[in-house]
UniProtKB/Swiss-Prot annotation:
Its main location: membrane. It holds the Pfam family ABC2_membrane_3. The lineage of its organism: Bacteria, Pseudomonadati, Pseudomonadota, Gammaproteobacteria, Enterobacterales. It comes from Escherichia coli (strain K12). This is Inner membrane transport permease YhhJ. Residues 44-172, 251-255, 305-342 are periplasmic.
Length: 374
């Protein structure tokens, strides 16, 4: 009972110390509000509401089909212009794509002459230019092939392909960006808060006080883990409900309590990593450099931004030992696909095992170095 009381009281001390750190409080609020909102609404790498202009010099049934095939959410409604206005519009940056459909286009297509359509792209808008060029090519080819097939043969196709988008019917990037921002910020803040809590002890000269008190390194470490983990757990839950579900209007398919249980297990592992890094760094700037070196690979290779199947096999095997890989997997399964515990229990068990391993390593390191931190 005395050990639990010591852990609780030391944790309260950590929370009070955090309340006096305005920089950390600002980082916490920013990470789960502005950062989440901007990640969800920023212009994505995929095509979204790209401005497009079309000079239809043919005015045929086929050219009208091509014009009407560009619609939201990939393109804004096409602006109809003349060929003479095309260069001026691109120079002024009014649209990213400008399409010139030549005269007699439909007649030449039906005659098998393979006419050309000119597509002008503003390549300075790199986020849309490369992807949009492929979209436009596929759309035009699809409309031309469909028109020619129906014109020459009025029979219905034997097979009709019906595509349905699961879990994100409108392919809205905000559904992915907002949730992934929360997942990444949970890992980042868990490491930063626990590591900085240890650095603060060194900078404020309170390590000596801890050494003369009847407490153990285990109690000190557990106090920092539960207090900083509780902060991240609470603010991430509020951000998921208020920002993602409320402000952004993203539907949450699965159980939020089940997701928060996964967050707690992930925090057990990542806060232990923060303690370990805090024993290595001698100051806040050093901790910041270590966080960059550790956090970037954890986030980039965990499967959140790039599918793990696209990575080399060796990288996949190495990342299986990291908690973020399993946390991203269970978070996406619960929040996107509505998975229950019967599906994500392997990730839960793996997080418990990885968390126990990181906690043991951090505790051994902490016991070894606490005397030299004074």
């Amino acid at each position: 009972m005395r050990h639990l009381r010591n852990i609780f009281n030391l944790g309260i001390k950590e929370l009070r110390s955090l309340l006096g750190d305005k920089a950390m409080l600002t980082l916490i609020v920013f990470s789960f509000t502005v950062s989440v909102y901007s990640s969800a609404t920023v212009t994505p790498g995929s095509l979204n509401l790209a401005p497009i202009a079309i000079a239809d010099m043919d005015q045929s049934q086929l050219s009208n089909r091509i014009v009407n095939s560009f619609y939201r959410p990939w393109f804004l409604p096409p602006e109809m212009i003349t060929a003479d206005e095309m260069d001026a519009g691109l120079d002024a940056g009014r649209y990213t794509f400008a399409i010139n459909i030549p005269p007699n286009f439909q007649r030449d297509v039906l005659a098998g002459r393979q006419p050309d359509i000119q597509v002008n792209v503003d390549a300075t808008r790199m986020s849309q230019a490369f992807t949009g060029n492929g979209y436009i090519q596929n759309i035009i080819n699809g409309e031309v092939n469909s028109f020619v097939a129906r014109y020459r043969d009025n029979s219905e196709p034997l097979v009709s392909l019906e595509t349905r988008m699961r879990f994100n019917p409108n392919l809205d990037p905000a559904w992915f960006g907002g949730v992934m921002a929360i997942i990444n910020n949970i890992t980042m803040l868990a490491i930063v808060l626990t590591g900085s809590a240890l650095i603060r002890e060194r900078e404020h000269g309170t390590v000596e006080h801890l050494l003369v008190m009847p407490i153990t390194p285990f109690e000190i470490m557990m106090a920092k883990i539960w207090s900083m983990g509780l902060v991240v757990l609470v603010v991430s839950g509020l951000s998921l409900v208020l920002m993602v579900k409320g402000v952004l209007g993203v539907p949450i398919e699965g159980s939020i309590p089940l997701f928060m249980l996964g967050v707690a297990l992930s925090l057990f592992a990542t806060t232990s990593i923060g303690i370990f890094m805090g024993t290595i760094a001698r100051s806040m700037p050093q901790l910041g450099l270590l966080v960059i070196l550790v956090l970037l690979p954890l986030q980039m290779l965990s499967g959140g931004s790039t599918p793990r199947e696209s990575m080399p096999q060796m990288v996949q095997d190495i990342m299986l030992t990291m908690p973020t890989t399993h946390f991203v997997s269970l978070a996406q399964a619960i929040l996107y696909r509505g998975a229950g515990f019967e599906i994500v229990w392997p990730q839960f068990l793996t997080l418990m095992a990885i968390g126990g391993a990181f906690f043991t390593i951090a505790l051994l390191r902490f016991r070894k170095t606490i005397g030299t931190m004074a």
